[in-house]
Amino acid sequence: MSEQFLYFLQQMFNGVTLGSTYALIAIGYTMVYGIIGMINFAHGEVYMIGSYVSFMIIAALMMMGIDTGWLLVAAGFVGAIVIASAYGWSIERVAYRPVRNSKRLIALISAIGMSIFLQNYVSLTEGSRDVALPSLFNGQWVVGHSENFSASITTMQAVIWIVTFLAMLALTIFIRYSRMGRACRACAEDLKMASLLGINTDRVIALTFVIGAAMAAVAGVLLGQFYGVINPYIGFMAGMKAFTAAVLGGIGSIPGAMIGGLILGIAEALSSAYLSTEYKDVVSFALLILVLLVMPTGILGRPEVEKV
């Protein structure tokens, strides 16, 4: 294989890895918007909290003498999902439910306030400096090599791909075949009609926040292990990128969030490799603007018709 092709292949691996985690976080944005038509701008901080919870659990278990990588990560996943889900439920009850019927600007201000509160809460309790995470998966598989370059898939990348696939599969099965999943779809179609038909819409909305928070927590554990460092401010940019992915794919569409995340991750990886890391954010948001100019509802979004 040529060195140029191997280099491109490596960037594709990196892009799919990054895009998978963006897609997981974007699920929360798109599900909440699909049902109540609001953006949860505190969602990125839930991702950050998931990273911190997994770090604390893994560190505690390692101090107890447990050093099996998969067991540590599994415990980190469980703890992060439980705590992040509780935060997601609390955000809905505190920041959204009281203002759900108010103007959207009020809900936006409430969400931004919750985001700032969570960010500063973690900064005060855990410190504002970077925290290094223990590296639990260090292996890699060489896919191809030339004289000066080798394309490889690390164990952590493989873990990210597998976990993302399983999480998306579980969510799809839940939405399509479970009773609560059907209730979620009904609320997404028409919230008022779903309420008239006897569906507990408050419960469905709270569940939507919990599911989104759980997905963000999974992404927090994965990216924390992938990058090896976390701080209280990682949630802002990750949240913005995931929001971009959701809008890119068509906000309100779960498959759109998946596609948008992958496109955004690959675009970032390629721009970092062939231009400069300084331009990756520029390329990401420029791509969003370009897509919205051509397809205002995103790739898989549906146009909304408002009757007056």
Swiss-Prot record:
Record's subcellular location? Cell inner membrane
InterPro entries in alphabetical order? ABC_transp_permease, BCAA_transport_permease
GO molecular function ontology, one term from the record? L-valine transmembrane transporter activity
**Matching Pfam families, A to Z?**
BPD_transp_2
Please give the residue ranges for the topological domain Periplasmic. 43-45, 90-104, 176-203, 267-280
A cellular component annotation (GO) from this entry: plasma membrane
Query: Which terms are listed as keywords in the entry?
Result: Amino-acid transport, Cell inner membrane, Cell membrane, Membrane, Transmembrane, Transmembrane helix, Transport
The biological processes this protein is annotated with in GO are:
branched-chain amino acid transport; D-alanine transmembrane transport; isoleucine transmembrane transport; L-alanine transport; L-isoleucine import across plasma membrane; L-leucine import across plasma membrane; L-valine transmembrane transport; phenylalanine transport
Keyword field contains Transport: yes
> Transmembrane region positions?
22-42, 46-66, 69-89, 105-125, 155-175, 204-224, 246-266, 281-301
For the Cytoplasmic compartment, the record's topological domain ranges are: 1-21, 67-68, 126-154, 225-245, 302-308
Q: Does the keyword Ribosomal protein apply?
A: no
Topology with regard to the membrane? Multi-pass membrane protein
Residues in the signal sequence: none
Cysteine disulfide links:
none
Q: What does this protein do?
A: Part of the binding-protein-dependent transport system for branched-chain amino acids. Probably responsible for the translocation of the substrates across the membrane.
The family classification in the record reads: Belongs to the binding-protein-dependent transport system permease family. LivHM subfamily.
Alphabetized PANTHER family for the sequence: BRANCHED-CHAIN AMINO ACID TRANSPORT SYSTEM PERMEASE PROTEIN LIVH (PTHR11795), HIGH-AFFINITY BRANCHED-CHAIN AMINO ACID TRANSPORT SYSTEM PERMEASE PROTEIN LIVH (PTHR11795:SF371)
**Full protein name:** High-affinity branched-chain amino acid transport system permease protein LivH
Which gene is the coding source of this polypeptide chain? livH
